[in-house]
Amino acid sequence: MMIKDILGNYSIIGTNQNESDETYNGTLSLGLDEKNRIIAKWLINKSQEQFGVGFFKENILVINFNYVGDENNTYFGTVVYKCFTKDILEGFWSEEFGNPQFLGSENCFRIKDQKELLS
């Protein structure tokens, strides 16, 4: 798989870095910058935006991300995805103030446009 193969929009479902079994939903958009690095943008539960920059090698995608949380504090973390196909990514993540006894998880499924679905 090449880096260009994973670019696009994904529907996501994930769990947080804690003991809860609660899930979150959202979207992940992957693009490239002028230096051929992955640029990521998440929209979690239709309200929280997260941003990241990463790299791709041997079907592994690593993204360092950040977001503004409570009281305007900025939080940082890293997510690692295994790219099973260009349409399915499975990952785990951790952030600096998360519970170190847990990892968050995230599964991503490519959002196909109407044209692709008709093919």
Describe these PLM feature segments.
Residues 2-119:
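Central antiparallel beta-sheet cores of small beta-barrel/beta-sandwich binding domains
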